[in-house]
Amino acid sequence: NCIVLDFFSGSSSTADAIMQLNADDSGHRKFVMIQLPEECEKKSDAYKEGYKNICEVGKERIRRAGNKIKSEHPNADIDVGFKVFRAADTNIKWNSLMDMGQIDINQMETSPDTIDFVPGAKDVDIVYELMLRQNDVPLSSKIEQIFGGGYERTYLYADSYLVCLETKITNELIDKLAELDPLPIKFIFRDSAFQDDIALKDETFRRLKAL
């Protein structure tokens, strides 16, 4: 059940070995591979096959290792999935007041995300960034979109953390959140979604805290 960390992981041979070892002894070891996206030499076989940097080579090796294990152990319950993260700037405007001078008022009304997030930010990236700041949440956990019917931007992470990126908080949404069972251990809202409705914000905190 250990976690193996490999800096400068190259083609991810460590990940390959760990996956094979798990398959052999039914272990549950996990791995974290860290590698700069160094470009492959243009004369190399990897480059000729379409892999422009060593990270792409590593990802393909992990995929092939997983496929090989699945073919060799067709009836085994083995997790061969993996996630890929890249170092990047923040997706969130943590100090919106500093950016207000750069925001068009009409744009604020038609695109509320302009207030809170950088252009092009995706919900999944925002959720992961928020979870990174929780310190004790593994990034291997699943993200689940829990509602529909007009509330497509509310997510449950690791079955414990609720991240609500809806542009407007409503009483109907709060009712839905209060009905969740089991209840998340933490709720994360965007302040702008309350649209300066202090009474609604107080009611939201009161109801969810009381639960």
Predicted segments with their positions:
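Accessory, often C-terminal, charged low-complexity segments
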Residues: N1, L21-L211
